């Protein structure tokens, strides 16, 4: 709704907008809407829509639909390709954001969850992609970014090189982020809108 202030006390109001039952043993999809409001002024700062996949929580008898179709990048070479090298210790540094999930720092916990080693926080990968879009399409003017969304497709391991492919279609931006040495798409169906 407006640029986020550098300092503010915000109120976060989260509500479930929908849920889809994928069936017993197949999970459920939960749609959430979060509205951030400046406590001092009452002004809406932003609205965030999230789609969560709840593994093992299907089969409860709810509707079996699915979220809206995801945006697709144009079928042509990307207008921009941006690379970011993540650091081997990046997940440990990113814990300063307050996410203390042991999946990002404990090798035994990560192995028990089925990963070869601790994985990078999804929000960190998301931030790298957002930085790439703001850098290439907004010339580092984040206030021009009106919306930003993507689908988390695969985990990133700290130390992976991230490569973000960006397509510009006037005020609409499409992007994907990959780990090229693994031939792995980690963020798919990326879509952003700009105030141009």
What are these regions (language model features)?
Residues 62-64, 71-140:
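Hot-dog-fold acyl-thioester-processing enzymes
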Residues 55, 98, 155:
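Residues that form or immediately flank small-molecule/cofactor binding pockets and catalytic motifs
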Residues 2-81, 158-159, 163-196:
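HotDog/MaoC-like acyl-thioester-processing domains
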Residues 108-184, 191:
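Catalytic-pocket segment enriched in acidic/His residues
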């Amino acid at each position: 709704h407006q640029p986020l202030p550098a300092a503010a006390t915000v109120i976060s109001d989260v509500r479930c907008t929908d849920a889809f039952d994928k069936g017993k043993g197949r999970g459920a999809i939960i749609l959430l809407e979060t509205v951030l409001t400046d406590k001092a002024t009452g002004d809406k700062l932003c609205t965030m829509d999230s789609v969560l996949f709840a593994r093992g929580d299907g089969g409860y008898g709810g509707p079996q639909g699915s979220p809206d179709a995801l945006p697709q990048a144009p079928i042509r070479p990307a207008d921009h390709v941006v690379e970011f090298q993540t650091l081997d210790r990046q997940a440990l540094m990113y814990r300063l954001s307050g996410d203390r999930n042991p999946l990002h720092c404990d090798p035994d916990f990560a192995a028990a969850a089925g990963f070869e080693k601790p994985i990078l926080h999804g929000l960190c990968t998301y931030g790298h992609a957002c930085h790439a879009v703001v850098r290439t399409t907004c010339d580092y003017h984040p206030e021009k970014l009106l919306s930003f969304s993507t689908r988390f497709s695969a985990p990133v391991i700290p130390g992976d090189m991230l490569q973000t492919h960006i397509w510009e279609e006037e005020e609409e931006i499409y992007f994907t982020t990959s780990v090229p040495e693994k031939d792995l798409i980690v963020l798919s169906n990326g879509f952003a809108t700009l105030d141009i």
